[in-house]
C-alpha cells in the first residue's frame, strides 16, 4: 500500500494528465458530496423552474439547476424555440452524442462536464508551467488550486457549458503560448461554438501573437479560424430563425442587455460585483507585466454592462479569466505564510457557492 501511494505520488509529480485526473476527481467528489448533503445546510429553492425535473429519481439532479436544464433540453429536443437561442450549441451537441450511449440525459451531461474539467485542469497546469518555466507539476498545482477552488468553480462540474468552454479556451491559450497557432486557432474555433465569450479567447490569441511579433497575415489567419465556430452558429440561426444574431436577441429575454438606472448601484452591492472589482485589479496588476493578460481581464470586466438586473453570470464567466487566478498565484506563491490562508479562504467561498448552487440558487 505504501509503495502504491509512493508510485501514485511520483506519477502525479511527472505526469500532468494523471495529476489533472486526480485533482478533478478530488474536486468532483467534494462538490457532489457537498451537494448531496447540501439540503441540510441550504434551504432548497421552491421554484420548480430552478431545477432539473425530468429525472426525479436521479440523485445527482442537484448538479443541474437554472441554465443546466436548458442545455439538457436542447441536447434532447434541439432549439425548439427562440427563447433558448442564446445557449451556444457545442455543449448540448456533445451531450446528445454521449446520450446515444448513456441512458440518462443528466448523466450524459455530467460525463461531458467532468471529462471537460479534466481537460481544463490539464491545460491550466500546462499554462502555469509554460508561463513560469516550472518543471515540477506539484509546484504548478499550487497555481491550479486557484482555478479549481475559484468560488464559482461548481459550474465546471455542473450541466453548464463552462467546463467544456474552459477546456477549449485554455487549450487555445496554451497552444498560443507555445506558438502553435494552428492548434490554437482550432481550439478557439470550438470555443466560439461553445460560449458567447469565445471571442475574447480569439482576441487574446491575436494579442499573444502580436506580442510575439508574428506576421500580420498569420495573425489574421489564426483569428479567422477562431471565429468559424461563431460564424457557423450565426449561419445556422439565420436559417432557423431568419436572424443571425438571434442569440443576442434572446439574451434580452434572460435579463441581459436590459440596463436600468440602478444597474451600477446593484453592481456595487452585489456579490457578483466583487468579481468585477477583482477583474479590474487583475487588469491593473498585469498591465506592466503582460498587457495581453490585462486587456483580457478588462474584456471580462466589461461584461457587467450587458448582464441582467440580478447581475447573474459575472462570477461564472470569470472562471476562464485565467489572469485573475494567476494574479493570486503570482503574488502569493512565495509568501509561504499567507499562501495557505488565501487558499483556505478560496475554499470557504467555493463551499458557499457550491452549497448555494446545489440548493437551486444561481451560485454566481
Language-model segments: what does each one mean?
Residues 107-108, 124-149, 183, 291-295:
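Transmembrane-helix signature of polytopic, membrane-embedded enzymes
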Residues 1-51, 215-222, 340-341:
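Start-transfer (signal-anchor) and selected internal transmembrane alpha helices
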Residues 62-103:
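Short hydrophobic/aromatic helix or loop-helix immediately within or flanking a transmembrane segment
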Residues 96-97, 108-133, 281-284:
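Transmembrane-helix motifs of polytopic, lipid-linked glycan transferases
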Residues 223-227, 334-362:
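Signature aromatic-anchored transmembrane alpha helix within multi-pass, membrane-resident enzymes
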Residues 137-138, 172-183, 210-213, 332:
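Membrane-interface transmembrane helices that cradle and orient dolichyl/undecaprenyl
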Amino acid at each position: 500500500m505504501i509503495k502504491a501511494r509512493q508510485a501514485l505520488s511520483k506519477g502525479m509529480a511527472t505526469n500532468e494528465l494523471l495529476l489533472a485526473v486526480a485533482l478533478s476527481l478530488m474536486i468532483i467528489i467534494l462538490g457532489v458530496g457537498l451537494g448531496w448533503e447540501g439540503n441540510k445546510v441550504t434551504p432548497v429553492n421552491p421554484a420548480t423552474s430552478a431545477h432539473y425535473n425530468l429525472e426525479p429519481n436521479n440523485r445527482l439532479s442537484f448538479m443541474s439547476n437554472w441554465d443546466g436544464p436548458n442545455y439538457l433540453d436542447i441536447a434532447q429536443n434541439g432549439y425548439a424555440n427562440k427563447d433558448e437561442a442564446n445557449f451556444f450549441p457545442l455543449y448540448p451537441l456533445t451531450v446528445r452524442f454521449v446520450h446515444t450511449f448513456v441512458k440518462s440525459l443528466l448523466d450524459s451531461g455530467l460525463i461531458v462536464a467532468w471529462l471537460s474539467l479534466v481537460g481544463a485542469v490539464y491545460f491550466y497546469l500546462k499554462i502555469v508551467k509554460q508561463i513560469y518555466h516550472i518543471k515540477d507539476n506539484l509546484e504548478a498545482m499550487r497555481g491550479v488550486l486557484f482555478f479549481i477552488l475559484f468560488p464559482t468553480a461548481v459550474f465546471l462540474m455542473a450541466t453548464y457549458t463552462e467546463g467544456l468552454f474552459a477546456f477549449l479556451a485554455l487549450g487555445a491559450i496554451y497552444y498560443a503560448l507555445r506558438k502553435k497557432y494552428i492548434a490554437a486557432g482550432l481550439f478557439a474555433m470550438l470555443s466560439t461554438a461553445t460560449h458567447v465569450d469565445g471571442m475574447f479567447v480569439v482576441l487574446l490569441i491575436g494579442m499573444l501573437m502580436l506580442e510575439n511579433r508574428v506576421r500580420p497575415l498569420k495573425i489574421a489567419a489564426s483569428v479567422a479560424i477562431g471565429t468559424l465556430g461563431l460564424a457557423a452558429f450565426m449561419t445556422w440561426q439565420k436559417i432557423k430563425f431568419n436572424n443571425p444574431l438571434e442569440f443576442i436577441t434572446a439574451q434580452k429575454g434572460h435579463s441581459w442587455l436590459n440596463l436600468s438606472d440602478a444597474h451600477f448601484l446593484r453592481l456595487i452591492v452585489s456579490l457578483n460585483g466583487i468579481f468585477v472589482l477583482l477583474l479590474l485589479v487583475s487588469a491593473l496588476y498585469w498591465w506592466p507585466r503582460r498587457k495581453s493578460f490585462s486587456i483580457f481581464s478588462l474584456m471580462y470586466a466589461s461584461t457587467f454592462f450587458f448582464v441582467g438586473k440580478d447581475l447573474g453570470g459575472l462570477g461564472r464567466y470569470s472562471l476562464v479569466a485565467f489572469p485573475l487566478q494567476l494574479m493570486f498565484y503570482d503574488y502569493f506563491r512565495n509568501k509561504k505564510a499567507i499562501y495557505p490562508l488565501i487558499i483556505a479562504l478560496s475554499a470557504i467561498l467555493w463551499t458557499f457557492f457550491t452549497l448555494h448552487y446545489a440548493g437551486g440558487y444561481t451560485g454566481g
